[in-house]
Amino acid sequence: MYTSIYITDSKKNLVFEYLLTSQAPTFQQLCSKIAGRDAAMDAMVAISKDMSLYRQAVGPEKLWYWALCQACGDPLEPQMFLAQYHQVLIEYFDKEALTVKKLVNNADRLALLLHAMLDAGEVAVTDSNRLRQLVPLRNDLSTILNSATKTLANTVKYADSKQLFGAPVATGKVEAGQTVPWRTADCRYVNNEIYVDLVETVNATLRQKGSSLTLINGSLSGKIDVKCYLSGNPTVQLKLRTSGHPLDNSALHRCVELGEAGVATMNFVPPDGRFTLAEYAIDLSAISQAARRLTNLGLVTVSLASGLGQHRDEFEIKVIIGNSTQVAAIEDLRITVYFPDISDAAKIKILRTTHGGWESDLSRVRGVWAFDKQTAVGSVPVLRGCVENPESTPHAPPVFPSHLAVSYSHVGQLPSGIRVDTIALSDLPPGSKPFKGVKYTSRAGDYIVRA
């Protein structure tokens, strides 16, 4: 049973709270129970004998969702609900990411959504389409109120008393039932459009062995997001070119009906608005060919060499960015370099860099090689440097980086090579000329290169 829901930033600053009972504690009252815990804290904190506080960090927005539950048998259930609530907010506001300002300015919407989703502390409604009907957006609600006010004003202005008080009561037209529960009945759009966004995140750990890289473990996390603004009750058939990757264990939206080709052919009646059609994961370690494993890491390959130079005390980081006619540039490329063995008196000295610049960290155990907003494909950026020991210890052993953390993104192709083959639409209103758009986005998640 849910007692209260809270939203904070990663520093535990309260953004929103929803108390289901008058006895439910505020987040400020709970802070003493979670004081001193860092970002790596447990996902569950016992508050009392039969009450626990669950935490879920969702998305790149660095928002923390909290649920105070009483007598919860399954510890995964609150975390799944919090992740689902975050997804409901994403789809409700039709945003790719949520900000603190957005949540603060729409606190009433957040409370109304939770009021609709929870009944007596138990989950009741989670369908985004149904929630949009129960809790209209501000612009939709304003349109309804303005229309009702205008109609009432015209009726009072032009009708006489006999019409007002002697006419029979008009009965409203009963709308036909929904074709499917996840889609609003009788949708109408001026511009019929459907956008399919495929996003893949690279998570990999590699080790430098001589001049070659060896994959220790790696995976690709992908999802297919759809924004659908189609009139009527259309049927969509989405065909994928999977590039030989089995996607049998994908998590699919309940609207999907699989064809004989499995996830490669998906038929569905789409919800209106934004929704996640499918999520999948590709285990790179399961690929038998080593060369193909590295190919599926994407366009960016980073290597680390140590013991270079006349005194064998230099290190070099090389970034090889592959050529692609589908990708214009690599965006927000950053490489964080870690020196755990550096002394307080030592200094990191950059000898040569072909791209970007070096940013020193106050902790002195790491630095960041930061590139421009965009880096051209086909380029090979190189950074060479060394760690200078103080004059008091001139014969100290050289210090080299222990590992690198890589982050970047680009648009145009996926590391796995998966692409949309066709998007076929049927059962649209006569004369409709829908627009179809496809976008591919690649990102680096936990991408580590060890020395």
Curated annotation (Swiss-Prot):
One GO CC term, this protein: Golgi apparatus
MHD domain location: 191-450
Domain of life: Eukaryota
UniProt keyword Chaperone present: no
InterPro entries: Adaptor_comp_med_subunit, AP2_Mu_C_sf, Clathrin_mu, Clathrin_mu_CS, Longin-like_dom_sf, MHD
Pfam families in alphabetical order: Adap_comp_sub
UniProt keyword terms in alphabetical order: Cytoplasmic vesicle, Golgi apparatus, Membrane, Protein transport, Transport
Subcellular compartments: Golgi apparatus; Cytoplasmic vesicle membrane
KW RNA-binding (keyword) present: no
Gene3D superfamilies registered for this protein in UniProt: 3.30.450.60, Mu homology domain, subdomain B
Entries under PROSITE patterns matching the protein: CLAT_ADAPTOR_M_1, MHD
Main localization, broad class: Golgi
GO biological process: endocytosis; Golgi to vacuole transport; protein targeting to vacuole
Task performed by this protein: Part of the AP-3 complex, an adaptor-related complex which is not clathrin-associated. The complex is associated with the Golgi region as well as more peripheral structures. It facilitates the budding of vesicles from the Golgi membrane and may be directly involved in trafficking to the vacuole.
Quaternary assembly: Adaptor protein complex 3 (AP-3) is a heterotetramer composed of 2 large adaptins (APL5 and APL6), a medium adaptin (APM3) and a small adaptin (APS3).
Stated family: Belongs to the adaptor complexes medium subunit family.
UniProt-recorded name of the protein: AP-3 complex subunit mu
Gene behind the chain: APM3
